Amino acid sequence: REFLLDVAKENVRYMEVRFAPTCSINAHMTYRDVMEATLCGLEEARKECGTFYNVIVCCMRHFDLETNLAMLKGCREFLGEGVCAADLAGDEASWPMSRFGELFREARKLDYPYTIHAGECGSVQNIVDAIEAGASRIGHGVAMKGCLEVQKLCRDRHIGVETCPTSNLQTRAVTVLKDYPVREFLNNGILVSVNTDNRTVSGTTLTQELLALQNQGVIAEPETVILMENALE
């Protein structure tokens, strides 16, 4: 609830909230309980502030197949009723995409659209593998900076790329913001957007992300409009 009210103060009109429901279940809370509580809070906030939302449920790389599948099945009843997609997040260096083929075959059987965190740790192959696994969007994707072949793959398949500048600086996925590849991605026709990743951990907002890129000369104000249109698309 608080999260949606906070982003509404930035004039955000639609927000996709992602989290890992498995981290909230316990002996007294089922997946249904977790999702009902989450969606109830978001809906209360929507009625108060007018900002619309959807939830992306995250599988975690360090969870086994059985655990991740249990989450997808446990949240399936909410798909189209507040849940819009699934995701795979976590340490991609230790758990590369090559380990998750079966998970996403099962996700497709359950009719989940999905985005996948890939290319944050420096492995461009994870991006390729995520696309081949059926991802319609890539979280981060900065590893394909300078890799025109993979950028062309994203462009040709209309893959959304969800960049997160401050988070990437903090995790050392990039070293300096002035060289951040958003402009490169835009110039090469990629459907790129700017995101916060984790507002609380990174201590940022969407407004701060966009202003930081503008202040470093990475983008100009007209490109901010393009990035927002890409996010909406």
Question: Predicted segment positions?
Answer:
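Mid-to-C-terminal alpha-helical segments outside catalytic/metal-binding sites
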Residues: 218-233
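Divalent metal-dependent hydrolysis catalytic cores, especially in the metallo-beta-lactamase
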Residues: 3-27, 52-58, 84
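Active-site core of metal-dependent hydrolases
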Residues: 84-97, 102-173
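Alpha-helical scaffold segments that flank or form the walls of functional sites
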Residues: 1-18, 36-47, 162
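Short, well-ordered coil/turn segments that N-cap beta-strands
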Residues: 12-15, 49-55, 80-84, 110-112, ...
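Alpha-helix-loop-beta-strand connector modules within alpha/beta enzyme cores
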Residues: 32-50, 101-115, 157-158, 162, ...
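Short acidic/histidine-rich active-site segments
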Residues: 115-121, 190-205
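Charged helix-capping and loop-helix junction motifs
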Residues: 32-36, 69-73, 98-104, 175-184
